[in-house]
């Protein structure tokens, strides 16, 4: 694994993505619907992964990714308005997920992306260890960064991450040492999991319930129900 690729916001990579995205016909401020996904740019990124570019579209909710037919090894949802990391269909091929520069405060429903190896969550709003509890499902995760999240300042944050992610090799661009593993294994953590709806406003919940009434596919119904914890 080339961990340097995690630093994807450097000038050269940003320029590459912007150049690729210049001719994208997707309209901003839209829901992540099937048309948006199918019309998005895809390409082979610098480390040879087939990547779908959905960055910078002001997307508020992760949804409808089933239309990708599990075709991509890398998914870029950076620089959007996403509040909850969840709503994924089963994506057995996905290995890298980029969610930098969103508004994420909660992680939920990640069992369907259990093959994920790299997760980038820089510059979000995750504030508690409980909000990270669902990451336990990512048993293959080897690299994650939460730089720019308030949770980094929580006592024993690093030890907690190492304890729930035994496959982790790189955390916040720093290699996980054997000493850290031993220390984390010896610790006990009193963490209360945060449910997804704990961070949804009344307006958000009302909007989701309205969308549930108007849903037309089983997949959409299941995704919304998961977000509402019905």
UniProtKB/Swiss-Prot annotation:
GO terms for molecular function: U2 snRNA binding. Pfam families: LRR_9 (PF14580). Gene3D superfamilies: Ribonuclease Inhibitor. One of its GO terms (biological process) is mRNA splicing, via spliceosome. InterPro entries: Leu-rich_rpt, LRR_dom_sf, RU2A. Belongs to the U2 small nuclear ribonucleoprotein A family. PANTHER family: U2 SMALL NUCLEAR RIBONUCLEOPROTEIN A. Associated with the spliceosome. This is U2 small nuclear ribonucleoprotein A'. It comes from Yarrowia lipolytica (strain CLIB 122 / E 150) (Yeast).
């Amino acid at each position: 694994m080339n961990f340097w690729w995690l630093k994807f916001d450097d000038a050269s990579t940003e320029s590459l993505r912007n150049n690729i995205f210049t001719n994208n016909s997707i309209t901003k401020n839209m829901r992540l619907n099937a048309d948006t996904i199918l019309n998005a740019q895809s390409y082979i990124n610098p480390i040879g992964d087939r990547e779908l570019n959905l960055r910078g579209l002001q997307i508020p909710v992760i949804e409808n990714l089933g239309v990708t037919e599990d075709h991509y090894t890398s998914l870029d949802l950076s620089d959007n308005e996403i509040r909850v990391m969840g709503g994924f269909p089963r994506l057995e091929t996905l290995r890298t997920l980029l969610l930098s520069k969103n508004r994420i405060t909660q992680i939920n429903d990640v069992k369907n992306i259990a093959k994920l190896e790299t997760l980038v969550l820089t510059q979000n709003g995750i504030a508690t260890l409980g909000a990270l509890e669902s990451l336990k499902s990512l048993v293959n995760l080897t690299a994650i960064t939460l730089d720019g999240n308030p949770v980094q300042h929580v006592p024993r944050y690093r030890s907690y991450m190492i304890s729930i992610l035994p496959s982790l090799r790189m955390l916040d661009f720093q290699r996980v040492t054997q000493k850290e593993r031993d220390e984390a294994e010896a610790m006990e953590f009193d963490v209360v999991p945060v449910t997804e709806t704990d961070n949804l406003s009344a307006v958000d919940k009302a909007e989701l319930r309205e969308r549930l009434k108007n849903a037309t596919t089983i997949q959409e119904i299941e995704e919304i129900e998961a977000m509402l914890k019905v």
